[in-house]
Amino acid sequence: MSSAPDPPTVKKEPLKEKNFENPGLRGAHTTTLFRAVNPELFIKPNKPVMAFGLVTLSLCVAYIGYLHATQENRKDLYEAIDSEGHRYMRRKTSKWD
């Protein structure tokens, strides 16, 4: 009657999969070609560069809007020359008004 000691209770932790260590595309199995073609999916975002790009893009859109607004105003104007030879801008008028 040999009494074997009771085996110690071992708590088994759930197995961690590799996909859960790195969430998103960084943990996904991809080819080298896919990583080379799409590096922005795997590189940590650079917030100062993103802020600079957002400000630059916003200024470009605002400038295009400004040019569009000034072009609309110039469309109704033409350069007139009076009898003394002075040039000035005059608004086009319709013959029907």
Curated annotation (Swiss-Prot):
UniProt region (Disordered), positions on chain: 1-26
Topology class, membrane: Single-pass membrane protein
A GO CC term attached to the entry: membrane
Coiled-coil residues: none
Record's compositionally biased regions (Basic and acidic residues): 9-20
Domain of life: Eukaryota
Residues that span the membrane, as ranges: 48-67
Cell location: Membrane
Listed Pfam families: DUF4500
Listed InterPro entries: UPF0708
Principal localisation: membrane
Alphabetical UniProt keywords: Membrane, Transmembrane, Transmembrane helix
Family (UniProt): Belongs to the SMIM8 family.
Name recorded for this polypeptide: Small integral membrane protein 8
Organism: Mus musculus
Gene that encodes the chain: Smim8
